């Protein structure tokens, strides 16, 4: 998912 890709960059899950 796109969320996983974004989280990979930030190093945290933006939930």
UniProtKB/Swiss-Prot annotation:
Keyword Cytoplasm: no
GO cellular component terms attached to this protein's record: phycobilisome; plasma membrane-derived thylakoid membrane
Example GO BP: photosynthesis
Disulphide bridges, residue numbers: none
Membrane topology: Peripheral membrane protein
Localization, UniProt: Cellular thylakoid membrane
Principal location class: membrane
Keywords linked to the UniProt accession: Antenna complex, Membrane, Photosynthesis, Phycobilisome, Thylakoid
Superkingdom of the source species: Bacteria
Family of this protein: Belongs to the phycobilisome linker protein family.
Task of the protein: Rod linker protein, associated with phycocyanin. Linker polypeptides determine the state of aggregation and the location of the disk-shaped phycobiliprotein units within the phycobilisome and modulate their spectroscopic properties in order to mediate a directed and optimal energy transfer.
Name under which the protein is recorded: Phycobilisome 32.1 kDa linker polypeptide, phycocyanin-associated, rod
Organism listed in the record: Anabaena sp. (strain L31)
């Amino acid at each position: 998912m796109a969320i996983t890709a974004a989280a990979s960059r930030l190093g945290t899950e933006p939930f």
